[in-house]
Swiss-Prot record:
It is found in: Cytoplasm. Pfam families: TsaD. NCBIfam families: gcp_kae1 (TIGR00329), T6A_TsaD_YgjD (TIGR03723). The gene is tsaD. InterPro entries: ATPase_NBD, Gcp-like_dom, KAE1/TsaD, Peptidase_M22_CS, TsaD. Its cofactor is Fe(2+). Required for the formation of a threonylcarbamoyl group on adenosine at position 37 (t(6)A37) in tRNAs that read codons beginning with adenine. Is involved in the transfer of the threonylcarbamoyl moiety of threonylcarbamoyl-AMP (TC-AMP) to the N6 group of A37, together with TsaE and TsaB. TsaD likely plays a direct catalytic role in this reaction. It comes from Christiangramia forsetii (strain DSM 17595 / CGMCC 1.15422 / KT0803). Substrate binds at T140, I141, S142, G143, G144, D173, G186, D190, N281. This is tRNA N6-adenosine threonylcarbamoyltransferase. The keyword Cell wall biogenesis/degradation does not apply.
Length: 340
């Protein structure tokens, strides 16, 4: 098997990024992402517009990925694609295209769970990229998900904690919207937080049993705080923006780290990885570095290009499924809610 070249063409279309990548034996040859700017004016992703943009982008993105990898279609060993979770209209574009390409080239089709792929991005073959060993804990943090996952093998994953309402990415974005920041607001909160005082304002941490999370009450607390303060001073947010952002970020990261500490204590697993769009946040990255020093954890943080939606992570998941000959048939359908 080691001498065989396994070229995986991967397709990702779960939300508003159209992405394609080519991996050879787990190493990235190309990783192309077409980001849809159309949603910014609406303050969030519009599913119908996302689906239409995927239809326009998918062919050129795949052509780019193959060209950059210097791979011909006939050299592709299998097609891996995101089956879910995500927006149904977006998923259907990638699923239909992957099935058609697989059928036309007469090569295997591999269906991938988007959230598993975020975790498996830690196993992309790169010389300077240390990988976790099994078992480890993975915290998936994004606009749609907040989970703590116990990972005992590539596809043996158990969700041991998750949000009971809103995801952490939504807490960042909605807080930003309340502050009058443009979409996507999460990265802007991170940017302003770096120059603010994280203890300037105090926000409540929701009390949730076990390893589960809740962020809906936190968003409400931010809203009421801003409404109350701007009533007294209409320019309050403008004057205190950096401190407010720092305090919001400090509280959210505190919620995440508290639950991770509890998960480490309950499982005895001290290897901890983060995955998903919010893992690009500088505060959570620093908090994990601090955790290594304070509590002796071994922490794994993905490269920035693998935090947001990308096809490289779909490709590495596809590669490990290919090794197991775990292929899908052509009756496979997209699933907007797809638990693992």
């Amino acid at each position: 098997m080691s001498d065989q070249k396994i070229n995986i063409l991967a397709i990702e279309s779960s939300c508003d990024d159209t992405a394609a990548a080519v991996l050879c034996n787990g190493k990235i040859l190309s990783n192309i992402v077409a980001t849809q700017k159309v949603h910014e004016q609406y303050g969030g992703v519009v599913p119908e517009l996302a689906s239409r943009a995927h239809q326009q982008n998918i062919v050129p993105v795949i052509h780019q990925a193959l060209a950059k990898a210097n791979i011909d279609k006939k050299d592709v060993s299998a097609i891996a694609f995101t089956r879910g979770p995500g927006l149904m209209g977006s998923l259907l574009v990638g699923t239909s295209f992957a099935k058609s390409l697989s059928m036309g080239l007469n090569i295997p089709l591999i269906e991938i769970n988007h959230m598993q792929a975020h975790i498996l991005a830690h196993f992309i073959e790169e010389d300077d990229f240390e990988k976790p060993t099994f078992p480890f804990l993975a915290m998936t943090i994004s606009g749609g998900h907040t989970q703590i996952v116990k990972v005992t093998d590539y596809f043996k994953m158990e969700v041991i904690g998750e949000t009971i309402d809103d995801a952490v990415g939504e807490a960042f974005d909605k807080s930003a919207k309340i502050l009058g920041l443009p979409y996507p607001g999460g990265p802007l909160i991170d940017k302003y937080a770096q120059e603010g005082d994280p203890k300037a304002f105090k926000f409540p941490k929701p009390k949730v049993d076990g390893l589960n999370f809740s962020f809906s009450g936190f968003k409400t607390a931010v809203l009421y705080f801003v409404q109350r303060e701007t009533k007294n001073d209409p320019e309050f947010v403008e004057k205190n923006l950096k401190d407010i952002c720092a305090s919001i970020q400090y509280t959210i990261i505190g919620i995440l780290i508290d639950k991770l500490k509890k998960a480490v204590k309950e499982t005895g697993i001290t290897q901890v990885a983060i995955a998903g769009g919010v893992s690009a946040n500088s505060g959570i990255r620093q908090a994990l570095k601090d955790a290594e020093q304070k509590w002796g954890w071994k922490c794994f943080v993905p490269k920035f290009e693998y935090t947001t939606d990308n096809a490289a992570m779909i490709g590495i998941a596809g590669y490990h499924k290919y090794l197991k000959k775990d292929f899908a048939d052509f009756s496979v359908t997209a699933q907007s809610r797809y638990k693992f």
